[in-house]
Amino acid sequence: MRSDSLWETTATNPPRQGAAPGPGGAAAAEPRGATPTGLPVSMKIVVAGGYAVGKTTLVGTISEIEPLTTEADITVESLGVDFAGPVQGQKTGTTVAMDFGRITLGPDMVLYLFGTPGQDRFLFLWDELVRGAVGGVVLVDTRRIEDCFPAVDYFEHLGIPFVVAVNLFNGVYRHHPREVREALSVPANVPVVLCDARNRLHVKETLVLLVEGALRRAQQHA
């Protein structure tokens, strides 16, 4: 059965509310070519989205090193603040600063992944996490699609290339990417893909798509 909230958003296309704060000096970095020393080019990628959308899972799935996570147990004080809707009760921890991982794409490129905290009270950390990033992945749960509005608005405001990745949760209706694009009102140049955050191949293909787009954009502005 289709998500009512998604179709209501698609039908009305209201302005996205609750955007993350504007840039405090944060700026997108342009990917550079191969270094003169022959060392791999490193790129910073930010993984953003709502609370309990799967950011920690995505980073952990693809990272070739033990991912650094900064999770804390959900306490009674979190009730009414950290609400995960349909997945409430399944999530016992929450990211309070960031997730960090690394993946090597070929012999000449290394990606450093930074996952943002999903709660509104940690939005002040975004400027530092995004500083120097070449692109972002906005992870979406279609049952709570409005939770990703701040991330979409933030990347659009900074002019940072990003990909919208719809996380494929078990037992959840799979909307066509076109429906999600309409619900988010993102332009045609922003890729919208289906991505199971638990599937390494899905995550890798999403990151490759993002990097290719960031490189093309950098070449166009060179």
Language-model features: locations:
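Canonical P-loop GTPase G-domain recognition
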Residues: 170-222
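Conserved G1/Walker A P-loop phosphate-binding module
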Residues: 2-88, 92-94, 101-112
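A general structural detector for well-ordered alpha-helical segments in enzyme core domains, enriched
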Residues: 151-154, 179-180
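Flexible phosphate-sensing "switch/lid" loops adjacent to ATP/NTP-binding sites
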Residues: 2, 102, 121, 186, ...
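Active-site-adjacent beta->alpha loops and helix N-cap segments on the catalytic face
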Residues: 147-149
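Inter-motif core of Ras-like GTPase G domains
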Residues: 119-144, 153-158
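A short helix->loop->beta-strand "cap" motif at the edges of active sites that frequently abuts
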Residues: 158-161, 189
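Conserved beta-strand segments of the P-loop GTPase G domain that flank and frequently precede/overlap
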Residues: 113-116, 136-141, 164-168, 194-196
